[in-house]
């Protein structure tokens, strides 16, 4: 040892060390979206518990009330879920008597999903859930509508980016330029 003290790079501010400045966690769009999503799910839980629904089941029922019967693939696409996530969800809903699943007579490879009478009966009670949630969200109706439009635009752009990335990855694999 020479007796000299040296500063480690961890003692030097990032800007002085020439490091790239990374935005703080609370400045990250992804974290704001992640936090908002988690909190919305928590707000829904006490509203959906009396109906015997989880938040993902609620979303599945909303999609099925709009388009039933639906193929498992179309439902997964509407919800943004892959079959490994969707199939167990549908099995629980079927066991609870909310939906039926059956093979498509026109194409045995396809499974059709639709609400049962019990599942349809929940529809009238969902309006109360929507109203209660609207009262819990700290946004004026016009703000909520604007946020919804912005998020819908964001989701469409992200889906496009994910699709383009997947296509580029597939092209690279086929051409051998990975």
Predicted regions and their residues:
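Charged, amphipathic alpha-helical coiled-coil/dimerization segments
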Residues: 41, 69, 91-149
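C-terminal regulatory/oligomerization modules of transcriptional regulators
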Residues: 1-21, 139-178
């Amino acid at each position: 040892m020479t007796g000299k003290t040296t500063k480690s790079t961890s003692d030097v501010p990032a800007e002085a060390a020439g490091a790239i400045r990374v935005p703080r966690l609370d400045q990250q769009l992804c974290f704001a979206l992640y936090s908002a999503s988690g909190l919305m799910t928590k707000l829904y839980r006490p509203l959906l518990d009396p109906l015997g629904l989880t938040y993902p089941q609620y979303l599945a029922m909303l999609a099925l009330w709009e388009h039933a019967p639906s193929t498992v693939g179309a439902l997964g696409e509407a919800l943004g879920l892959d079959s490994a996530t969707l199939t167990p969800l549908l099995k629980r809903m079927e066991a609870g008597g909310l939906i039926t699943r059956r093979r498509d007579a026109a194409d045995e490879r396809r499974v059709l999903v639709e609400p049962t009478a019990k599942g349809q009966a929940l529809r009238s009670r969902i309006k109360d859930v929507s109203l209660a949630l609207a009262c819990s969200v700290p946004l004026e109706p016009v703000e909520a509508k604007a946020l919804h439009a912005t998020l819908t635009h964001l989701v469409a752009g992200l889906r496009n980016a994910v699709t383009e990335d997947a296509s580029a990855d597939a092209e690279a694999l086929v051409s051998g330029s990975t």
